[in-house]
C-alpha cells in the first residue's frame, strides 16, 4: 500500500509540474514571426507579437519602415506607447503631413500618443523599426485615404 501511495504521489508531483510549465510565460521570439507588408502604405511592414488588436486585450505590434516611408496622418481609438528600436523616427501631430513640424525620436526613446490624436511618422534618414503597445481594440483610421 505504501508503494502505491508513493507512486501516486510521484505521478501527481510530475503532472503538477508539467501543468505549471504549460501555463507559465511563453516567450515570443520576434525573429520567428514574419513581417507582413501593408499594401495601403508602401514601405511599411508589421507583425503582431502579442495579441492582434482586435479585442479588449493587450497587444504588442512591431513595425518596420523602409527609408523615406511616410505613414500619413491617422488616429487610433486607444492610446499607444511607442518605443523606437532602431533608426530615428520622425513624428508629427496634426491632420496634415508637415515635414517642418516633425520631431526626431532616436532609438531607445519612448513616446505616448493619446487616443484619437492625429499623427504621422516618417523614416526620413533610413530604415526604422519600432514597436507599439496598448490595449485593444485598436485600428488605424487615416485622416484621408493614403494615395497608392
What are these regions (language model features)?
Residues 18-59, 102, 145-148:
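A short, N-terminal "cap"/entry segment at the start of jelly-roll beta-barrel domains
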Residues 59-76, 105, 114-115:
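Conserved short histidine dyad/triad with adjacent acidic residue
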Residues 5-15:
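Bacterial N-terminal signal peptides
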Residues 71-73, 91-92, 113, 118-124:
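Short beta-strand His + acidic residue motifs that chelate non-heme Fe in jelly-roll/DSBH
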Residues 68, 88-89, 116, 126, ...:
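Solvent-exposed coil/turn segments that connect beta secondary-structure elements
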Residues 24-26, 100, 120-148:
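Double-stranded beta-helix
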Residues 66-67, 76-96:
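Glycine- and acidic-residue-biased ligand/ion/polar-headgroup-sensing regions
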Residues 95-115:
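Short acidic-glycine-tyrosine-enriched beta hairpin
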Amino acid at each position: 500500500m505504501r508503494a502505491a501511495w508513493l507512486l501516486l504521489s510521484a505521478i501527481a508531483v510530475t503532472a503538477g509540474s508539467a501543468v505549471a510549465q504549460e501555463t507559465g510565460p511563453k516567450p515570443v521570439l520576434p525573429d520567428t514571426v514574419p513581417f507582413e507588408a501593408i499594401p495601403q502604405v508602401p514601405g511599411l511592414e508589421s507583425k503582431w507579437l502579442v495579441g492582434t488588436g482586435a479585442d479588449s486585450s493587450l497587444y504588442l505590434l512591431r513595425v518596420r519602415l523602409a527609408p523615406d516611408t511616410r505613414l500619413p496622418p491617422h488616429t487610433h481609438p486607444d492610446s499607444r506607447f511607442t518605443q523606437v528600436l532602431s533608426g530615428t523616427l520622425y513624428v508629427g501631430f496634426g491632420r496634415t503631413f508637415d515635414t517642418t513640424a516633425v520631431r526626431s525620436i532616436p532609438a531607445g526613446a519612448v513616446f505616448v500618443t493619446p487616443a484619437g490624436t492625429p499623427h504621422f511618422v516618417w523614416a526620413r534618414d533610413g530604415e526604422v523599426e519600432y514597436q507599439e503597445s496598448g490595449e485593444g481594440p485598436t485600428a488605424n483610421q487615416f485622416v484621408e485615404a493614403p494615395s497608392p
